[in-house]
């Protein structure tokens, strides 16, 4: 059976809506692939609640890394962990999906390099055919839609545009198995440090604009 992994982008223990949209798209893609298993990748600190919530939005299973090195977003430890999980997986995913948020784009670009595969960014539509995933990709400021496919490289690493897919209705009380994993890097192996956040007041995130 095919496998799909979905990176759940979160901030301070709260998942972004785009993550649940991506999870919903993954479930539809799984049906196209004949019933693939959808696994949520939840990375951060104090995020076990997000892993549990992922089942309500369609995840069949979840992998959780809850560690201080992932408390603040730094692309290297996140990408290194996704790459390591893929390399060590007994049943490797055919596809790794994530939301095309700032963090999602950064993580997937670096993870694709570490895995020696291609990355398809900012998908606005997705479907499976003959073992490959076809992604509708907007070009020229959305005036043209192209179809992109990675026919030979695996895993297929894809980010999906926020609000391009509907957010699924949560199934309250749905549960599943959570596999806890260790981080790929120790703190002294990470070269960057987050010292704080600057809030830009009066502006709305484009990802949340209605």
Regions found by a protein language model. Give the residues of each.
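N-terminal glycine-rich FAD/FM-binding segment characteristic of electron-transfer flavoproteins
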Residues: 1-210
